[in-house]
Structure formats: C-alpha cells, structure tokens
Amino acid sequence: GAQFALARNGSVIAEGYFGDATPDTRFCMFSATKALVSATCIPLIESGALDPSRPVAHYIPEFAGNGKDHVLVEHVMLMQGGFPYAPMGPKQWATSEGRRERMAGWRLDWEPGTRCAYHPMVAHWVLAELISTVTGRPYTDVVHETLTAPLGLAPLIGPTVVEDPCHDVRATGERPPDSAIAEVLGGMHYVMPSTIALDALLVMNRPATRIAGVPGGGGFARAGEIALVYQRLLALPAVAFEVRNRMVSDTDNVVANR
C-alpha cells in the first residue's frame, strides 16, 4: 500500500491512498525520521542550549574515546563526522548508558569536517543523545513537543507509535547493480556501498524497535502528518529568515541549509 499528501500554506490540500493502505495507516518513515531529529536541534541551537561549534564530547564526555574529541556538533549535523558505519544495536540503544558506552568505542574513518558522507543510522543516535542531554528529557518527548504537538498530531517516534496501526515493512524487488545506479547518478563515485542488510530493515517491524524510536529511521507516520511537519518547519522564522548556507564539499558543491 501507499499514501500521498500535498500541503501548502500550513494545510494539506490533497491526499490519497492505494492498495491495502487506509487513511489511518502509518508507514515507517525510515530516513525521513532524520529530519525530525535534526529539526528538533534548531530551537536548542537558537536558545543557546546546544552550540554547533562545540565538540560533541563537551556534552557527551564518553564520545571523546578513540580520538573523537574534536568531532563538532556541526560535523554530526552535516554528516561530516567521519563515523558513517559505526556500530549501534538494540542492546546498546535501549539506554543512555548503553549508547554512550558504544559511542566511546567508535573509531573515525576520516578527519571530521574534511568530507561529507551519508551516515545511515549512527549520526542521529548522537543527535538524539545530545537532545536528551541538554534538555534532561527523552529525545522522543522533545521531538514531539517541538514539532508534532503544536500541530495537534500524535507522536511520530517513540513508545506510543505502537498504539496506531502501522504498515509492516516488506521486502520487494532487488537492489539494482552499482553500474545502473551510477548511470542514473552520473558516476560510480556517487554510488554508496550497500551497508544496510535486509534484516536490519525488517527489524522495524518489531514492537520493541518501534517503541525505542530509532532516530535515524524509526519514525512512523501518515503522509499527511509528514507534510504538515514540513509546513511547520517552513514557517519557523529561524528557518525562513536565518538559514545559513554551508558548502559541505568543495568538489560537488552540495549546499546544506541549516
């Protein structure tokens, strides 16, 4: 099944659904969840509670392990941290202590800030831990209070998502060969390695995983809810009038709006 939604000026103006989806069905947002967690950092930065120019270790001392003391909050938000495939599993992510212990053991693949590469899951575990640290509350609660509660929406990430019907993740089709992806993207240097196995995606069907609120891909939402969240972000003065542009790569000239 599938849903679609189109929003403008703060309202959903068109939506529909296909297959076995209904208007009430929630789908796993996967990486669209990242935007919720990153956007929650905006008011924390604006208030001074979180400083993007400070090292992550300023807020999470354990993170400094194995030479990561100079990784900045900004590096993590721009996916320049240098630890894209660092490990983090259910046994660690269940508690703050477990997350911090795992982060302490991570090692860098390159010098932070020197290149940009997609961090499939772990960068947003760092952001989630930062949110919890500077607010003293579970990051899932802060995401809801910042983004979804003002819209009158139920939480899209965290323990309460299991209260609504959620469409199970299904495996369909096969990954195209790297050569086909390169043809579409314009070169092999744009093709990311396939690092997320099918089992890692299907784990989102487990109630315990949904309750955990995986910040890099564990949100559950209807299409209209996602559209409304982005409408709210577009309306925030800090986003509409104070966006700073940073070229994240001198070679591909990709602009990151923050």
Features from the language model and the residues they span:
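A short, well-structured edge-of-sheet supersecondary motif
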Residues: G1-T22, P52, K91-Q92
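Conserved strand-loop elements at the edges of beta-sheets that form or border functional pockets
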Residues: L6, S31, P120
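Short, solvent-exposed turn/loop segments enriched in Gly/Ser/Thr/Pro and often Arg
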Residues: R8, V56, H119
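Active-site SXXK
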Residues: G10, C28-R54, L127-S132, V229
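Short helix/strand-bridging catalytic loops that position acidic/His residues to coordinate divalent metals
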Residues: D20-T25, I60-F63
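Short, glycine/proline-biased beta-turn/loop segments that scaffold the active-site neighborhood
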Residues: D51-N66, P150
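Short, surface-exposed loop or secondary-structure junction motifs
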Residues: N66-R258
